[in-house]
């Protein structure tokens, strides 16, 4: 029974994380990045991988 609870917990965490992913492209459609939980905390966004956000 304990093993079942662990498997169910891992399954619930994975189901939650897979629903919180996405893909963003800039207006010119020449640069994009993926995020895991929220676009604002994406590493590519933080380091400016697509340049200034105004573009």
UniProtKB/Swiss-Prot annotation:
Highest taxon listed in the record's lineage: Bacteria
Gene name in the database record: yhfL
Name of the protein in its database record: Uncharacterized protein YhfL
Matches recorded under PROSITE patterns: PROKAR_LIPOPROTEIN (PS51257)
CC per GO annotation: membrane
Membrane topology: Single-pass membrane protein
Subcellular locations according to the entry: Membrane
Primary location group: membrane
Keywords: Membrane, Transmembrane, Transmembrane helix
Parts of the chain that traverse the membrane: 7-24
Keyword Transmembrane helix: yes
InterPro entries found in the cross-reference section: DUF4223
């Amino acid at each position: 029974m304990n093993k079942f609870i662990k498997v169910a917990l891992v399954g619930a965490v994975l189901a939650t994380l897979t629903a919180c992913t996405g893909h963003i492209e800039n207006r010119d459609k020449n640069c994009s990045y993926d995020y895991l939980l929220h676009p604002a905390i994406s590493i590519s966004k933080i380091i400016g991988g697509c340049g200034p956000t105004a573009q």
